[in-house]
Each structure stands twice: as C-alpha cells, then as structure tokens.
Amino acid sequence: MKDSLPVPAPTMTDFLLALVSTALINNFVLQWPLGIDPLLQAPADGARLRIHALGLATTVLMLVSCVLGHVLYRGVLVPWGLQSLQLFAWLSLSVLLIRPALHWLPRALPGLPFDGLWPLLLANAGMLGLLLIASGENLGLATLGAMSLGAGLGFWLVLSLFNDLRQRISTNDIPLPWQGLPIDLISAGLMAVAFFGFNGLPKT
C-alpha cells in the first residue's frame, strides 16, 4: 500500500528546496489557490501590524497543525485503517488549534494585535490542502514541516504585498463597477502573474 511505503530521509538541500518552492514557486495563495479567502477578507485599510499579526498566526498554525496532523495520520489513522476519517480529523485539529494560538501569541508578542483574527484563520484552507497533498505524495515529517513553514511564509509575503497594493490603488479613481472585490481579484491575478517569474528557481 502507498501508506506503508518507507519515506526517504530528506537532506538539508531537500529541506531548503521545499521551503523556497512552497513559499515562492508553488505559492498556496496565488498558484493553487488555497488561503485566498482570508487574503481577500483582510481589511483594505488594515494597519501594518495587524497584517503581520495575521501572517504570523497563519504561519504558526500551518506549521503546528500540519506536523500534528501528519503524526495523527501516520500514528493513528493509518495503523487503525481509518484513512477515510482524515479530512474530519484534520479539520477538527485545525479548528481546535486556533484558540490556543490566539491565546499564546499575544503573550509572546504583545505588540501585535491578534484580536479578531479568528474568522480569518478559520477560513484558511491552506492547512487542509497541504495535509491532503502530503498524504497523497507520502511526504516525510521534515519535508512536510518545511513545506508548511514555506506555505505560511508565502502567505505572509503575499498578504503584505497585497496590502501595499491595496493602499496604492485606494487613492486612484477606479470606476464604480470595479471597486471592491473585482479590483482585488484583478490585483491578485496580476500578483500571480508576477510570481511566475520565480518558476526559473529549482523546484521540489
């Protein structure tokens, strides 16, 4: 069975390639697109600190939930033949981790505004998507950790760039039918085209 195949030990090069590839080349927001909803739902006039708070919280949640979800899948679901419950188990795990993350992150970084991020974190499908990809490709724990960290950092980068782009076009005279979601989708599409320039980098 595919689930019982041995996973080769990754090298440091594999780790770095997985990190860079997921953050820039196979960006979960622009290329897949997973996690696009919190990107579009983020306040257009959001403060820089709040954008960084959302990016950091998403990165931490993706890393922790993907690693724990992988351990849960390999250690519990596969040995007991419960692979059909993987989506339910991962979804429950992702939701349950949001509250502890929003409890401990403000204590560790009191300067960042983490309040009110629950809906945006709950709507991020990147965690489930990454776990489904990992289970289908038989990825090891270290590779999955690098991919989840890269996916979170990639989301953080796109979120910051998208917020800057929103701030720049907010003062422009945009026709009424294009205001709001239409111009946001066009902006995200242009960013996706720009990120195609990273395709020349090595991929995993």
Segments (PLM) and residue ranges:
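Structural signature of hydrophobic alpha-helical transmembrane segments
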Residues: D14-L30, W80-S94, G145-V158
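Juxtamembrane boundary at the C-terminal end of a transmembrane helix
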Residues: V193-T204
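Small-residue-rich segments of transmembrane alpha-helices in multi-pass membrane proteins
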Residues: L56-V67, G116-L132, F155, G180-A192
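Ordered, amphipathic secondary-structure segments that act as subunit-interaction surfaces
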Residues: V71-L120
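Generic transmembrane alpha-helix signature in multi-pass membrane proteins
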Residues: P33-Q41, L102-P106, L117, A125-G140
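Interfacial loop-to-transmembrane junctions
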Residues: Q167-I186
